[in-house]
Swiss-Prot record:
GO cellular component: haptoglobin-hemoglobin complex; hemoglobin complex
Oligomer status and interactors: Heterotetramer of two alpha chains and two beta chains.
Tissue: Red blood cells.
Protein name, entry field: Hemoglobin embryonic subunit alpha
Function description: Involved in oxygen transport from gills to the various peripheral tissues.
Any one Gene Ontology molecular-function term assigned to this protein's record: oxygen carrier activity
Binding site for heme b: H90
Domain of life: Eukaryota
Any Pfam family matching the protein: Globin
Amino acid sequence: MTSLSAKDKDVVKAFWAKISSKATDIGADALGRMLVVYPQTKTYFAHWKDLSPGSAPVKKHGQTVMGGVAEAVGKIDNLTAGLLNLSELHAFTLRVDPANFKILSHNILVVLAIMFPNDFTPEVHVAMDKFLAALALALAEKYR
């Protein structure tokens, strides 16, 4: 995996500062897309009455997901240690297949490109892709 350079980290932090006010919308859209495009991911949310994009549970969990992304931006210099509790939660309690972190990361990138077309430059795209890959790896840490 490619590590985040100092420049990547600066780009991620600057982009996050621009988009963080829309984090709830980003998370809801990304999660809704994931559930439609990758229907196998619905198994983790079978207890929800409505799995459709824009539903209350999807919006709420999208907000939760993006809260985790915000936490990761704040701990960008040591994601593995900084996200240890989230890694343990997903590995031991929720038992989420870590492959799903990559799927959701992809959907977050899609939504960022749609919602922020002028700010989502190739440089931002690369930095955010590397950041989300590093985040997915940090979340998968306790699966080893």
